[in-house]
Amino acid sequence: MAISIKTSEDIEKMRVAGRLAAEVLEMIEPYIKPGVTTGELDRICNDYIVNEQHAISACLGYHGYPKSVCISINEVVCHGIPDDAKHLKDGDIVNIDVTVIKDEFHGDTSKMFIVGKPTILGERLCRVTQESLYLGIKMVKPGIRLRTIGAAIQKYAEGEGFSVVREYCGHGIGRGFHEEPQVLHYDADDGGVVLQPGMTFTIEPMLNAGDYRIRTMKDGWTVKTKDRSLSAQYEHTIVVTENGCEILTLRKDDTIPAIITHDE
């Protein structure tokens, strides 16, 4: 497994790409309201990426994906395709997943939005999913096994009564959208990967309110929970530092510091 170690110049470019991706999620928030279509949200994001940020949407055309962002509602786990016929409604939980390319480097991030008045379950699932991401990020430092992080996320999520999707995971990122290693959010063989300074990857747990099993729709992209239960996901791109990590896609609404250090 060839895991690339980024140079300081690479990391600086990834800070820029990561900041741009985060800014898309900050920009779109006021538009998330009952009645808006996911197609309209996609166009707003694309216009902002192309015309304001002078960047590229990594999703558009990736393996034939037809839109600029992924918008996944309620029981949709990931890769929901924006559609002018799909209107948001009160109580929906919505994930928007954005990946921006700037100067050849990628920034990848997603967050949950709650439309109008939240349901108790929807709000709790979103909160626990974000907390599981933060838990994983706070563990990142040189010398730790990736498997340790996945096991901790799984234990926390299941302790809260939720399940962790198995088929999708975090990934290395840089010049490539998806690089080595795979970052699993549950306890499984990680190929012995030990973190080193300069590694860049995403952590992006997907938690279901019901069973962890999923199914892919006929469009070949949209993934839903098999039991139709709600699903939530949060994602950040991070870099391993000499004594911890730095979040490259931090937003103003995040409640975790950008730089996390361990003083052992």
Curated annotation (Swiss-Prot):
Family: Belongs to the peptidase M24A family. Methionine aminopeptidase type 1 subfamily.
Name of the gene encoding the protein in the UniProt record: map
Molecular function via GO: initiator methionyl aminopeptidase activity; metal ion binding; metalloaminopeptidase activity
Annotated positions binding substrate: 79, 178
Binding note for cofactor: Binds 2 divalent metal cations per subunit. Has a high-affinity and a low affinity metal-binding site. The true nature of the physiological cofactor is under debate. The enzyme is active with cobalt, zinc, manganese or divalent iron ions. Most likely, methionine aminopeptidases function as mononuclear Fe(2+)-metalloproteases under physiological conditions, and the catalytically relevant metal-binding site has been assigned to the histidine-containing high-affinity site.
Needed cofactors: Co(2+); Zn(2+); Mn(2+); Fe(2+)
Entry-linked InterPro entries: Creatinase/aminopeptidase-like (IPR036005), Pept_M24 (IPR000994), Pept_M24_MAP (IPR001714), Pept_M24A_MAP1 (IPR002467)
Name under which the protein is recorded: Methionine aminopeptidase
Keywords: Aminopeptidase, Hydrolase, Metal-binding, Protease
Binding residues annotated for a divalent metal cation 2, in chain numbering: 108, 171, 204, 235
Functional summary from the UniProt entry: Removes the N-terminal methionine from nascent proteins. The N-terminal methionine is often cleaved when the second residue in the primary sequence is small and uncharged (Met-Ala-, Cys, Gly, Pro, Ser, Thr, or Val). Requires deformylation of the N(alpha)-formylated initiator methionine before it can be hydrolyzed.
SUPFAM superfamilies xref list: Creatinase/aminopeptidase
Quaternary organization: Monomer.
Domain of life per record: Bacteria
Catalytic activity: Release of N-terminal amino acids, preferentially methionine, from peptides and arylamides
Example of a GO cellular component annotation carried by this entry: cytosol
Major enzyme class: hydrolase
One example of a Gene Ontology biological process annotation: proteolysis
The EC number(s) this enzyme carries: 3.4.11.18
Binding-site residues for a divalent metal cation 1, renumbered to this chain: 97, 108, 235
Lineage: Bacteria, Pseudomonadati, Pseudomonadota, Gammaproteobacteria, Enterobacterales
